[in-house]
Regions:
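Aromatic-anchored, glycine/proline-accented short structural segments
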Residues: 146, 150-230
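C-terminal non-catalytic interaction modules
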Residues: 1-28, 238, 242-304
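Structural signature of alpha-solenoid helical repeat junctions
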Residues: 30, 67, 115-122, 142, ...
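Amphipathic alpha-helical segments of tetratricopeptide repeats
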Residues: 20-22, 52, 56-61, 93-114, ...
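Intrinsically disordered, low-complexity segments enriched in Gly and acidic/Ser/Thr residues
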Residues: 212-254
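A generic tandem-repeat structural signature
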Residues: 52-139
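Tandem amphipathic alpha-helical repeat scaffolds
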Residues: 2-10, 30-47, 67-85, 122-139, ...
Length: 304
């Protein structure tokens, strides 16, 4: 993520080693990009209402299409975390509309300037966001097409996996989720030469490798959570339980409440005698006080 000329504490809380800082207080944003970073950090610890307010501030403070797109993509992520995929698709559509038309006519060459890099990351965020929304509305084939488009764009415009770790990690996340939602469909190819590998496991493991070499603790934790889910789906419950226990501890220590809720839900399935269900319920109650309304199956809880 290009974070030049922004407060380093905000950057570290959003995409670095100290996401828990957002739970105790963050510096005031000096501009639209810092407001976006504040929103990302606040969303990571489950302060949804505060994150949405910060996204609104960011949108009022900029006319840059790429940054505006990122604010909409972040709002889509917040909605998806709570189960509101249909609503998320609307704001992710706005994110895509802000950057995709310009991307169509762009010269097929690596992004070179900070502005070009930001635009390319916004394109990838919009495409992976829409793919995740498609999964949540039971359209895995659409998700796979969007992921393929993102992969091709990423390979051309952000070819350096080291500097473009975040869009690549996200691509592996949603690829793994798509493979999990449509097992045996062949919609998702494995990201390696071993074509016999389980695509969900392979993408989850690839995300872990990339995230472990990134500065973002939150991305490392989420990648291990996804690997725990993929391991459970493949029948390796021991590995899943071990990973989920590790993830729960990290979420607790670093105030990653949304991920701890998701981990609790997984743990309630792979270890029914444990405290996963209780932890998930407690997290859901706390998220609700922070503006995070989880969608029920019948949507009786209302709108997000």
């Amino acid at each position: 993520v290009p974070v030049l000329e922004v407060n380093s504490e905000l950057a570290d809380a959003a995409f670095g080693s100290a996401p828990e800082r957002a739970a105790v207080g963050l510096p005031t944003a000096a501009g639209a990009r810092e407001s976006w970073l504040r929103a990302v950090a606040l969303g990571g610890v489950g302060h949804y209402a505060a994150a949405r307010a910060e996204l609104a501030r960011a949108r009022r403070a900029t006319a840059d299409p790429a940054l505006l797109s990122l604010t909409h993509g972040t709002e889509g992520s917040l909605l998806r975390q709570l189960g509101w995929h249909t609503h998320a698709a609307v704001v992710d559509g706005r994110a895509a509309a802000l950057v995709l038309p310009a991307a169509v006519g762009r010269t097929p060459a690596p992004a070179a300037t900070p502005a070009e890099i930001l635009h390319a990351e916004a394109v990838c965020d919009a495409l992976t966001g829409l793919a995740a929304d498609a999964l949540g509305t039971l359209r895995p084939a659409l998700a796979a097409r969007l992921l393929n488009r993102c992969r091709k764009y990423l390979d051309i415009h952000l070819p350096d996996a080291g500097s473009a770790w975040r869009p690549r990690v996200r691509l592996h996340w949603v690829s793994a989720e798509t493979a999990l939602s449509a097992p045996g469909s062949g919609l998702i190819s494995v990201p390696s030469a071993d074509r016999s590998a389980d695509p969900a496991l392979a993408h989850a493991e690839a995300a872990v490798v990339l995230a472990e070499n990134s500065p973002s603790l939150r991305h490392r934790v989420k990648s291990r959570l996804l690997l725990a889910a993929a391991s459970a789906a493949s029948g390796d419950l021991d590995r899943s339980r071990a990973l989920a226990t590790e993830v729960d501890r990290d979420c607790r220590d670093h105030e990653l409440l949304p991920l701890r809720w998701a981990c609790g839900m997984l743990r309630s399935g792979v270890e029914p005698t444990g405290d996963g269900a209780e932890v998930a319920a407690a997290c859901a109650r706390l998220l609700a006080t922070r503006g995070g309304r989880l969608r029920s199956a019948s949507e009786v809880l209302g709108r997000p």
